């Protein structure tokens, strides 16, 4: 099959719509269930590239959670801690495969943004992963294969309409890309730049300490950024993106946005949050929304009399600004990557407030000296990669 007709394009008025191979060859995908749309396929093909490259670079099962052609989260398949299981709504005794852990962690980066996501898996989808997907609000998944049990589980989701796409893992795209804008065709070479540990050798700070986990985190961050709409900044810890700032015109706004998301991720581990007593049978999205409001400055919206009873069995104590600040100050060992250079040291100042100890960015600012001096002030290890990673 070299063409697949779609219901419409980005919006219902944009018809006709299809995906096809210009050279007349067969599409490298098979739709096993559902009817994916135009944006679904944009998410699918971008997210597949991300997880394929992350698996190749780390030799670990990798997953991503995409919304509107940018990752809400991405991660490698490391085991979940007891706290991870609690904040990601996983049963304590659940038997999880590495690829299931990868997706649970990817979705856990920003569960609000992952609502209605497109999932991407580097490895064959098994029953453990399918069962977790089934419990979440998700639009579809792309993977190189599915076990029979996993496929049957996924076919029961969304009243049988869940989108399941299988991609040929050996497919190699053409070296040139084309895109039409306003009737004008753009051409460029594919971004085949390989991101691996060799990219991390130019350490420009006084502190040269770069443990193996930090190298993995830098790779996870940079590959995530490679498929994030620019400008973009990504915070990572233990092989998991914990804050992705995408599509901002200002670098510092990217760093702030991603940093706030990283802070929100960490606040979900605060003892007061872990101790919240939710009403029985609360839906996962409602629980996610409640946690988000509770940890924000708008906490009164959910703790007001006559309101909190809809969500909690017992009225929670306020998580004060002082408590939040003190908790976030205990965060450490975080890595941050940027798809282009930090123009000033203010990005480093903001990043270190979210526990950043390691930075990977291209370098090349006329104020690199100021950026390096700021990193040195806090004992941060920073690599200049020399490679910009814009994505549009």
Identify the meaning behind each predicted range:
Residues 1-199, 214-232:
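Active-site loops and adjacent core secondary-structure elements that bind or stabilize anionic groups
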Residues 23-35, 109-115, 189-208, 285-307, ...:
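Gly-rich Lys/Arg/Thr-decorated short loops/hinges at beta-loop-alpha junctions or inter-strand turns
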Residues 53, 227, 264-268, 353:
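Conserved helix-loop functional segments at active or binding sites
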Residues 57-65, 164-167, 230-237, 267-279, ...:
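Flexible, glycine/charged-enriched surface loops at secondary-structure junctions
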Residues 70, 125, 237-240, 248, ...:
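Active-site-proximal loop/turn and secondary-structure-junction residues that shape catalytic pockets
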Residues 72, 117, 121-122, 135-165, ...:
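C-terminal binding/interaction regions
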Residues 72-112, 242-342:
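Glycine- and Gly-Pro-enriched alpha-helical subdomains that act as flexible
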Residues 220, 228, 235-238, 245, ...:
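Nucleic-acid 5′ end/cap handling module spanning
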């Amino acid at each position: 099959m070299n063409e697949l007709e779609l219901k419409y394009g980005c919006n219902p008025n944009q018809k006709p719509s299809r995906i096809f191979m210009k050279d007349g060859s067969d599409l490298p995908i098979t739709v096993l269930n559902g009817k994916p749309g135009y944006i679904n396929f944009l998410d699918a093909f971008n997210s597949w590239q991300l997880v394929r490259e992350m698996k190749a670079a780390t030799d670990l099962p990798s997953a991503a959670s995409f919304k509107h052609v940018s990752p809400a989260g991405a991660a490698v398949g490391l085991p979940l801690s007891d706290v991870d299981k609690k904040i990601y709504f996983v049963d304590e005794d659940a038997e999880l495969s590495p690829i299931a852990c990868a997706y649970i962690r990817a979705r856990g980066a920003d569960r609000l943004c992952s609502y209605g996501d497109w999932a991407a898996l580097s490895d064959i989808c098994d029953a453990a992963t399918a069962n977790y997907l089934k419990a979440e609000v998700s639009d579809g998944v792309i993977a190189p294969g599915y076990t029979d049990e996993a496929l049957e589980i996924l076919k029961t989701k969304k009243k049988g309409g869940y989108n399941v796409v299988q991609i040929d893992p050996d497919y190699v795209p053409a070296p040139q890309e084309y895109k039409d804008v306003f009737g004008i065709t753009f051409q460029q070479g594919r971004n085949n730049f390989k991101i691996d540990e060799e990219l991390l050798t130019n350490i420009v700070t006084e502190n040269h300490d770069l443990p193996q986990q930090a190298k993995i985190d830098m790779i996870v961050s940079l590959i995530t950024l490679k498929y994030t709409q620019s400008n973009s900044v990504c915070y990572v810890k233990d092989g998991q993106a914990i804050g992705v700032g995408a599509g901002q015109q200002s670098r510092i706004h990217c760093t702030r946005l991603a940093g706030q998301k990283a802070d929100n991720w960490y606040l979900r581990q605060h003892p007061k949050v872990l101790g919240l007593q939710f009403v029985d049978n609360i839906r996962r999205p409602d629980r996610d929304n409640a946690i988000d409001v509770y940890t924000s400055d708008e906490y009164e919206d959910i703790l007001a009399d006559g309101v909190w009873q809809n969500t909690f069995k017992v009225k929670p104590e306020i998580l004060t600004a002082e408590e939040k600040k003190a908790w976030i100050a205990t965060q450490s060992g975080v890595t941050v990557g940027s798809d282009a250079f930090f123009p000033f040291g203010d990005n480093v100042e903001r990043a270190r407030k979210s526990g950043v100890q390691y930075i990977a960015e291209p370098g090349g600012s006329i104020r690199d000296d100021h950026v390096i001096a700021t990193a040195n002030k806090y004992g941060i290890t920073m690599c200049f990669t020399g490679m910009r990673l814009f994505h549009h």
